[in-house]
Amino acid sequence: MRNTEKYAGKRVLVVGMARSGIAAAQLLCKAGAHVIINDSKAAEQLGDSLKPLENLPLERRLGCPAMECLDGIDAMVISPVVPDNAPFVLKAKEMGVYVTGELEMAYQLSSGEMVAITGTNGKTTTVTLLGEIFRNAGRTTHVVGNIGYPYSAAGLDSQDGDLFVCEVSS
């Protein structure tokens, strides 16, 4: 794990409790952050998806708008589906809160190197092919991002020398 100083001991709001939000919360807890999770859905609606977070020391603010969770936070990690211009994101930036996406946060904390693939067509094919090429070359390779496996999840146990091949939205 690298660059934990950006998050260790800080109050970090993670917005969106789908796969990438759950993994982001796990990685941030491992980095020593005081994690606050938020989703507009209540815990009952999220159901078993929150199970990976059961034994982690985090604060839950579920079933309420993210705008109501901004006071006292140092940083905010948003899920890939949250637009940069969402009102609560703009408000957080206005308040001086460090706002980043799950992908950037995972890169900052995970050991290893990243190759990011973006574009209009062919991203999934390219990412999958590169993953196989690097694996066959003997590299420990994680195919992550919009391909369905969160970078944060792979980053939990990453080692120096690991390679992340990441599909990124255009």
Residue ranges of model-derived segments:
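Phosphate-binding loop of NTP-binding sites
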Residues: E68-D71, P80-S170
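N-terminal leader/targeting and accessory segments in enzymes
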Residues: M1-G101
